[in-house]
Amino acid sequence: MSKLFVFDLDGVLIDSLPNMEHAWTSVRVKHEINVPFEDYKAQIGKPFPDIMRELGLYDRHLEIYETYKTHSRRCLDQIPLYDGVYDTLTELKNQGHKIALCTSKNRETVSLLEHKLPEFDYISCPKQGLRGKPAPDQLLFVMAFCNVDPIDTVYVGDMEFDQQAALRAGVHFEYAEWGFGDLVCDHSLKSITNLI
């Protein structure tokens, strides 16, 4: 039976942590912010405005985002895929499964990274009318678009917010052990290749 495999992007498919740290360092310098990267990292998985709210920087989130985006995009081509990602996603599609992306990255940035990955059946980025993770909205929208029920859906993520979104959407969650988070889960993957 075919399934829908939904993937988070950062920390699951791409190793973007060095890029994020570089961009956050630029933000700290330009905007004279004393929030360490570890505090930012703990919020990864949420939409950027929500991260800024958690860090007490929401009143400046638009200007901070512009700095972050500019410095992050300068190095996008240097962000590698994790080992086995391309082949695993391709094999899942070859087996007749659907694959989708559910990320907190904006669509414009994702479009600059898409060429590194196989074609997805759907890509969900934050959009008006849908709450970001840990709310289930994006996952529910992906399933509706792909015509797949929660029981036939697997969400692979690396952060607590991914796990919460999966639980709230009623889908099976697989924790990506190689990612940015530090979770204790009943179901985890040592490598993305464990999916095939």
Spans of features found by a protein language model:
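Conserved phosphate-coupling serine/threonine residues in phosphotransfer and NTP-handling enzymes
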Residues: V12, T103-K105
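Short glycine/serine/threonine-biased micro-segments
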Residues: L9, Q43, K98, Y155, ...
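N-terminal helical cap/lid subdomain that shapes the substrate entry/recognition surface
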Residues: S2-Y86, Q95
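Short, acidic loop-to-helix structural element flanking the phosphoryl-transfer center
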Residues: R74-L101, S111-E114, P136
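Residue-level detector of anion-binding/catalytic polar loops
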Residues: N34, K98, H172
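Asp-based, Mg2+/Mn2+-dependent phosphohydrolase catalytic module
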Residues: M1-K3, K93, N106-I196
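Short glycine-/small-residue-rich flexible loop motifs, especially phosphate/cofactor-binding loops
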Residues: T25, P49, L89, L140, ...
